[in-house]
Amino acid sequence: MPEVDRFGRLPWLWITVLVFVLDQVSKAFFQAELSMYQQVVVIPDLFSWTLAYNTGAAFSFLADSSGWQRWLFALIAIVVSAILVVWLKRLKKGETWLAVALALVLGGALGNLYDRMVLGHVVDFILVHWQNRWYFPAFNLADSAITVGAVMLALDMFRSKKSGEAAHG
């Protein structure tokens, strides 16, 4: 069995910090520059900047609830973040892909957790749409990092399964 060094893959936490900082800076910028639901078209019929607040989870799930969801989602984010840090610490030296994936998910989770705890909602500003017919729910850099990290985790599981290795975790 490969040896785990004292800190595992924790040095990859610089990615987590970078995601968190970029997420918070971008949210502060768009909050300062845009009014609520204002759209600034970047690519006509495809991509716009907008400012929206999400009190729910992904895709505004439970956003219309009375406020209890803020604490539920915060608790989930804290537990998941702790699990990700432990998982990251236990990784072996050759598991760089997995370390990057976990660091991305962790950075995104912490970015949205900060919003939820400090502001009471998550700040979203990226809007993908097709003409005026279809709109994907607004999202932010933290959501993007979580998505990219999750896709990387899925690819790692498929790669491990295909090569006959035990799945990580």
Curated annotation (Swiss-Prot):
Q: Which family does it belong to?
A: Belongs to the peptidase A8 family.
Q: Which residues form the active site?
A: D124, D143
Specify the pathway: Protein modification; lipoprotein biosynthesis (signal peptide cleavage)
Q: Does the keyword Transmembrane helix feature in the UniProt annotation?
A: yes
**Which Enzyme Commission number(s) are on file for it?**
3.4.23.36
Output the GO biological process annotations, alphabetical, semicolon-separated.
proteolysis
Catalytic EC class = hydrolase
Keyword set, alphabetical order:
Aspartyl protease, Cell inner membrane, Cell membrane, Hydrolase, Membrane, Protease, Transmembrane, Transmembrane helix
Q: Which organism is it from?
A: Pseudomonas paraeruginosa (strain DSM 24068 / PA7)
* GO molecular function terms noted in the UniProt entry: aspartic-type endopeptidase activity
Describe its membrane topology: Multi-pass membrane protein
The residue ranges crossing the membrane are 10-30, 41-61, 68-88, 94-114, 135-155
Job of this protein: This protein specifically catalyzes the removal of signal peptides from prolipoproteins.
The UniProt entry, under NCBIfam families, shows: lspA
Which Pfam families does its entry note? Answer: Peptidase_A8
Indicate what this protein is called per its UniProt record. Lipoprotein signal peptidase
InterPro entries for this protein? Peptidase_A8
**Where is the protein found, in the record's own terms?**
Cell inner membrane
One Gene Ontology cellular component annotation held by this UniProt entry: plasma membrane
Q: Which reaction does it catalyse?
A: Release of signal peptides from bacterial membrane prolipoproteins. Hydrolyzes -Xaa-Yaa-Zaa-|-(S,diacylglyceryl)Cys-, in which Xaa is hydrophobic (preferably Leu), and Yaa (Ala or Ser) and Zaa (Gly or Ala) have small, neutral side chains
